[in-house]
Amino acid sequence: HETDPDGHVLNSLMLIVMKFQREFSNLKDAFMTVHKARSFGSGSERLYVTNKEVGNFEGLGEICRQAGGRIPSPQLKNQNKAFANVLERHNKEAYLVVGNSANFTNWAEGQPKKADGTCVKADTHGLWHSTSCDDNLLVVCEFYFIL
């Protein structure tokens, strides 16, 4: 190019881009190390985290979305165990979402009972129960990272 006949500007820009690529790669590696360490103990790629507050089902969805997560929806036994570990630590129950095509369920004996409510909660053992959507339960959000 006429304003940069020797390509110095282009070379400088290429060096800057390469530096950002290295920094991004390092950041991604660090993030994945933390994620793997957090999920190591539970054997689940999904993280279940509480802010130690309580709330109803409607409020939970918004809280989880704002935090970058979602309402828990364990799809495998190890995910349900990781979720139950949080509940056991805090000795509280929490809401979860059961998908229509769920291959995994963990209903307590005699459940689900629509008469008990249209939402689902997990107890400290990870067993699922029908419940009212207005109950104030422990706020737990699910975070699932795909890189």
Curated annotation (Swiss-Prot):
Classification of source organism: Eukaryota, Metazoa, Chordata, Craniata, Vertebrata
Organism of this sequence: Gloydius brevicaudus siniticus
Designated name of the protein: Phospholipase A2 inhibitor subunit A
Chain ranges of the C-type lectin domain: 62-143
Disulfide bonds: 64-141, 119-133
Family: Belongs to the alpha-type phospholipase A2 inhibitor family.
GO MF: carbohydrate binding; phospholipase A2 inhibitor activity
GO cellular component, one term: extracellular region
Glycosylated position list: 103
